[in-house]
């Protein structure tokens, strides 16, 4: 069903109502029949409320087939239609506390409950409260305790026969238990998929190379409406009973809560997250309690449901149009909404990660007004085909950062622009680089970039780096936020008067920090390299670089081929080191650190190149515990013979020396057919080299 023509303005109510009806019907068809919802709930609700308002203001515009007069879509071909003996109606919705208070007032008035002079209800109504599941509504028919038929809600009057598929759901009893078994019982409830089961299902889909489901609701609906019940049987579906249709041969419980208690005695699954409360205050307390726990629930819900508890009071209140007067669905703030994407900027993280960020026309979603949403990375923007000018679906759940889920392609304007990742950092102008096989692009100005300033300073001061005692995160925050320190070099310009002026920084603390900074000026080359915070360069690699080159300048000027000669440095690490020193901003900060004797270290000649021999150019991996040699001693012997000692096994590994308790490295070597030596074999190899 194609999307409706151009949206008419509100000043033309007849055309506007016709457009709204067509748009809602199209959305209903996608939701109920195709199981491919393409309109967020909040947008559907907004359009539905607008149509209700227009029809209330212009009764002559109401049509018999208006969505306000019925519930949802048609039966899909391939399933036998089932006419419900008692219609499966939807509920009126409430979105704010005021809607709940108004509902309680209407109910109290309808039941002639006592009120005071101010109109406040003094005889509170008793309500049954339960969760509103985000699944698929169904009706189960039992005859003399045996399950005989299941049908979907469909349009509320006619649904689809899904009996064989429902039989596969283990949570649904095929035979009722207990003593009060009715001749006929229609159980109303919801088929859903728990979050953990949804995650496992998508894992299976990925492993099989099949399409993943967008959310548990889509997975449940798609599973239930399979023509092949074997597919349904393989899907982890669940069920909760919450209502009743036809009942014959047994007494109807006096209350709704009593009905659910009776269902439990019959062996039907009933959700335990329910309560009986009194008045609007009780309803709102239940709503807010559930809202606080919503994210931790094992299944998705989109609100709670209130029902007048006493059956006789339900009968007195009756129904209006498409919904009962005695019930209300109180929805949580929508987690998805439509809005326009006006621009895509990039944001620089503390580690230099470049993240595309969508700038949005303000939209209320997930309980807050959202104007920005993450696009994660460049690949995600391409995969989702999101462009500037698109109408997009934005999702915000709980405290999760808002994200753009997808673009609404048939609303894309002709002038929509594709996103182009910038080549320079917007914060500092340094080059943006993206290493092979990495999804994240990064700013290369690690020592200079304002966005990375706090992280760079914190790493620089670490105990294993320059070990600047007393320079913690809170002090760094103050120094950066007061613009006292921009780069690590600025730390060594800090004076006593500057430090004592900081919040909660006593004279003794200031003197101690100045002493630590003075001490940090005398370090080692390995510590200094590590302190620079070069991506992928840890303590061990920093030591290997210092040992191999002997001084800093050769490292800064080394081409990638020269870096690859360093022990344990592979292509990714070599590329990262090369990029760091190729960025002029980083070199400037390093020169500032070295200028006027600020930071010094003893330098020496580069490590002697290993003599040529059987191990020259060979890569060896050590694993396990050797009988007589420590790992370090064995490494020195191998390197002296010209070998490169690596930390992991790959196709480029020439030998693996294995001792006791060798683990995955030994297994990998055997899998790749790499020669494995014990300590004696290593000595034999070295002796062969010596000769």
UniProtKB/Swiss-Prot annotation:
Gene3D superfamilies: 5' to 3' exonuclease, C-terminal subdomain, 6.20.10.30, BRCT domain, DNA ligase/mRNA capping enzyme, Helix hairpin bin, Nucleic acid-binding proteins
Catalyzed reactions: NAD(+) + (deoxyribonucleotide)n-3'-hydroxyl + 5'-phospho-(deoxyribonucleotide)m = (deoxyribonucleotide)n+m + AMP + beta-nicotinamide D-nucleotide
Domain BRCT: 610-691
A GO CC term attached to the entry: cytosol
Extent of the signal sequence: none
Organism: Burkholderia mallei (strain ATCC 23344)
Residues engaged in binding Zn(2+): 425, 428, 443, 449
Key words of the record: DNA damage, DNA repair, DNA replication, Ligase, Magnesium, Manganese, Metal-binding, NAD, Zinc
Superkingdom in the source lineage: Bacteria
Official protein name in the record: DNA ligase
Catalytic residue list: 132 (n6-amp-lysine intermediate)
Function noted in UniProt: DNA ligase that catalyzes the formation of phosphodiester linkages between 5'-phosphoryl and 3'-hydroxyl groups in double-stranded DNA using NAD as a coenzyme and as the energy source for the reaction. It is essential for DNA replication and repair of damaged DNA.
EC number annotated for this UniProt entry: 6.5.1.2
Binding site for NAD(+): 41-45, 90-91, 130, 153, 190, 307, 331
Gene Ontology terms for molecular function: DNA binding; DNA ligase (NAD+) activity; metal ion binding
InterPro entries, per the entry: BRCT_dom, BRCT_dom_sf, DisA/LigA_HHH, DNA_ligase, DNA_ligase_AS, DNA_ligase_CS, DNAligase_adenylation, DNAligase_N
Stored PANTHER family: CHROMOSOME TRANSMISSION FIDELITY FACTOR 18, DNA LIGASE
């Amino acid at each position: 069903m194609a999307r409706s023509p151009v949206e008419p303005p509100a000043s033309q109510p007849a055309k506007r109502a016709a457009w709204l009806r067509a748009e809602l019907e199209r959305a209903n068809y996608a939701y109920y029949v195709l199981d491919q919802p393409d309109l967020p709930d909040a947008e559907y609700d907004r359009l539905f409320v607008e149509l209700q308002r227009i029809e209330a203001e212009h009764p002559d515009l109401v049509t018999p087939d208006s969505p306000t007069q019925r519930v949802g879509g048609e039966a899909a071909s391939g399933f036998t239609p089932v006419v419900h003996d008692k219609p499966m109606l939807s509920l009126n919705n409430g979105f704010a506390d005021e809607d709940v208070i108004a509902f309680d007032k209407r109910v109290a008035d309808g039941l002639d409950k006592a009120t005071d002079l101010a109109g406040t209800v003094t005889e509170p109504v008793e309500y049954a409260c339960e969760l509103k599941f985000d699944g698929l509504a169904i009706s189960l028919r039992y005859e003399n305790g045996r399950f005989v038929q299941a049908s979907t809600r469909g349009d509320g009057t006619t649904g689809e026969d899904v009996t064989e598929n429902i039989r596969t759901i283990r949570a649904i009893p095929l035979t009722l238990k207990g003593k009060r078994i009715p001749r006929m019982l229609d159980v109303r409830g919801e088929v859903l998929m728990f979050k953990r089961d949804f995650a496992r299902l998508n894992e299976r889909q990925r492993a099989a190379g099949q399409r993943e489901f967008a959310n548990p609701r889509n997975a449940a609906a798609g599973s239930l409406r399979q023509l092949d019940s074997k597919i349904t049987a393989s899907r982890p579906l669940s069920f909760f009973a919450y209502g009743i249709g036809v009942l014959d041969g047994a007494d109807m419980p006096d209350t709704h809560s009593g009905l659910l208690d009776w269902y439990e005695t019959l062996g039907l699954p009933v959700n335990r997250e329910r309560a009986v409360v009194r008045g609007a205050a009780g309803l709102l307390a239940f709503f807010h309690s559930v809202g606080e726990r919503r994210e931790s629930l094992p299944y998705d819900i989109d609100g709670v449901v209130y029902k007048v508890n006493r059956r006789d009071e339900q009968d007195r209140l009756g129904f209006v149009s498409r919904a009962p007067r005695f019930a209300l669905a109180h929805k949580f703030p929508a987690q998805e909404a439509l809005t326009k994407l006006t621009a895509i900027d990039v944001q620089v993280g503390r580690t230099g990660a470049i993240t595309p960020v969508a700038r949005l026309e303000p939209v209320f979603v997930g309980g807050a007004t959202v104007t920005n949403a993450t696009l994660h990375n460049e690949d995600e923007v391409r995969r989702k085909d999101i462009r500037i000018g698109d109408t997009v679906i934005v999702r915000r759940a709980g405290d999760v950062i808002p994200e753009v889920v997808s673009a609404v392609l048939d609303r894309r304007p002709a002038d929509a622009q594709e996103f182009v990742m910038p080549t320079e950092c917007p914060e500092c102008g340094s080059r943006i680089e993206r290493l092979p096989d990495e999804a994240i692009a990064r700013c290369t100005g690690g020592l200079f970039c304002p966005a990375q300033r706090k992280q760079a300073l914190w790493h620089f001061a670490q105990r294993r780096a320059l070990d600047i005692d007393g320079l913690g995160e809170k002090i760094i925050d103050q120094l950066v936020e007061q613009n006292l320190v921009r780069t690590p070099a600025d730390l060594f310009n800090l004076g006593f008067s500057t430090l004592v002026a900081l919040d909660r920084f006593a004279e003794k603390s200031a003197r101690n920090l100045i002493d630590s900074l003075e001490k940090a000026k005398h370090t080692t080359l390995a510590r200094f390299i590590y302190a620079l915070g070069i991506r992928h360069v840890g303590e061990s690699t920093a030591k290997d670089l210092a040992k191999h080159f002997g001084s800093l300048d050769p490292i800064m000027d080394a081409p990638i081929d020269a870096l690859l000669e360093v022990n344990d440095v592979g292509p990714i690490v070599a590329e990262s080191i090369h990029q760091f020193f190729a960025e002029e901003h980083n070199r400037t900060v390093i020169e500032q650190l070295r200028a006027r004797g600020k930071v010094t270290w003893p330098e020496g000649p580069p490590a002697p190149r290993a003599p040529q021999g059987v191990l020259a150019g060979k890569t060896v991996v050590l694993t396990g515990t050797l009988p007589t040699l420590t790992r370090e001693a064995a490494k020195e012997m191998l390197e002296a013979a010209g070998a490169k000692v690596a930390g992991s096994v790959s196709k480029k590994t020439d030998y693996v020396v294995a001792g006791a308790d060798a683990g995955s490295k030994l297994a990998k070597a055997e899998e790749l057919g790499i020669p494995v030596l014990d300590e004696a074999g290593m000595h034999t190899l070295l002796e062969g080299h010596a000769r």
